[in-house]
């Protein structure tokens, strides 16, 4: 498929055109940098203030501002991104609103709408625009394929207290991913989800240094530490490269063993 040629370095994604949403920090930022290192041309999409404050270690990212709560803005930003790239091979839908909203009994309509609008509807609209661009650029013809990677969460299939809106929206992303995989297979578009567990988005192991959070990680994560954004980005590279050509409708869980056991299961094991 066509690319704009912002990056010409050899790598596993050489010649590929990619869009990453939620690109200004954490997993999104690490994915942008990993894709650039692997030779892709990359549009980094996020809220304007966040993009303005972001400096990538790898040169070449094309910043485009977009608010995932604004439906019209999504279509416009995606069209701009595809035009500037000259096509689209890879979409990483990672933009999300994080955090809890209190007990379910106190969950307001406004908070529910806010989380669903960004995390669920924003993902849907981004992926629909991306898939349409991929088909228009020739995905599914002459053996050409494309990739959509959603960023879910262990909360896509595991609940936690006082986060009903976030958990429900992330669960929706999981099923949307599977539905897209089925519908888009005929067009050569492979769709998969990455489900991270606790990730230190500061990137320097300080995000979980607060004693309560540190103890929680020790109790709940088999590896005894939070993940790093770069460890999640590694999976995003794998799912985007040619070697993943028979993987679709699947989830890669990156949680250090959190979902493999009962919460608190490591409490005795570390003594």
From Swiss-Prot:
Pfam family, one: adh_short_C2
Keywords (A to Z) from UniProt: NAD, Oxidoreductase
InterPro entries (alphabetical): NAD(P)-bd_dom_sf, Sc_DH/Rdtase_CS, SDR_fam
Family matches, as Gene3D superfamilies: NAD(P)-binding Rossmann-like Domain
Origin: domain of life: Bacteria
Catalytic activity: an N-acyl-D-mannosamine + NAD(+) = an N-acyl-D-mannosaminolactone + NADH + H(+)
EC identifiers of the protein: 1.1.1.233
GO molecular function term, any single one: N-acylmannosamine 1-dehydrogenase activity
Binding site for substrate: 153
Keyword S-adenosyl-L-methionine: no
Function as written in the Swiss-Prot or TrEMBL entry: Acts on acetyl-D-mannosamine and glycolyl-D-mannosamine.
Miscellaneous comment as given in the Swiss-Prot or TrEMBL entry: NAM-DH may be applicable to the quantitative determination of sialic acid in serum.
Assigned protein family: Belongs to the short-chain dehydrogenases/reductases (SDR) family.
Protein name: N-acylmannosamine 1-dehydrogenase
Source organism of the structure: Flavobacterium sp. (strain 141-8)
């Amino acid at each position: 498929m066509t690319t704009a040629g912002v990056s010409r370095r050899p790598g596993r994604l050489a010649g590929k055109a990619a869009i990453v949403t939620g690109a200004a920090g954490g997993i999104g930022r690490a994915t942008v940098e990993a894709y650039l290192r692997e030779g892709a041309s990359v549009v980094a999409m996020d809220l304007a203030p966040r993009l303005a404050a972001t400096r990538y270690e790898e040169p070449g990212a094309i910043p485009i501002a977009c608010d995932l709560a604004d439906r019209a803005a999504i279509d416009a930003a995606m069209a701009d991104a595809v035009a500037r790239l000259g096509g689209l091979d890879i979409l990483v839908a990672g933009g999300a609103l994080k955090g809890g909203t209190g007990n379910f009994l106190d969950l307001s309509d406004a908070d529910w709408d806010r989380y669903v609008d960004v995390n669920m509807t924003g993902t849907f609209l981004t992926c629909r625009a991306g898939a349409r661009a991929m088909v228009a650029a020739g995905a599914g013809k002459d053996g050409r394929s494309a990739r959509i990677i959603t960023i879910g969460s262990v909360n896509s299939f595991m609940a936690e207290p006082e986060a009903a809106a976030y958990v429900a929206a992330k669960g929706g992303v999981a099923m949307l991913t599977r539905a897209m995989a089925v519908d888009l297979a005929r067009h050569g578009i492979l769709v998969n989800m990455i489900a991270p567990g606790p990730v230190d988005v500061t990137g320097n192991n300080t995000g979980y240094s607060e004693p309560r959070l540190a103890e929680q990680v020790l109790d709940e994560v088999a590896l005894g530490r939070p993940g790093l954004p770069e460890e999640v980005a590694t999976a995003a590279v794998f799912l985007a490269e040619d070697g993943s050509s028979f993987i679709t409708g699947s989830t890669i869980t990156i949680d250090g063993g959190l979902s493999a056991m009962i919460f608190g299961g490591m409490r005795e094991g570390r003594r």
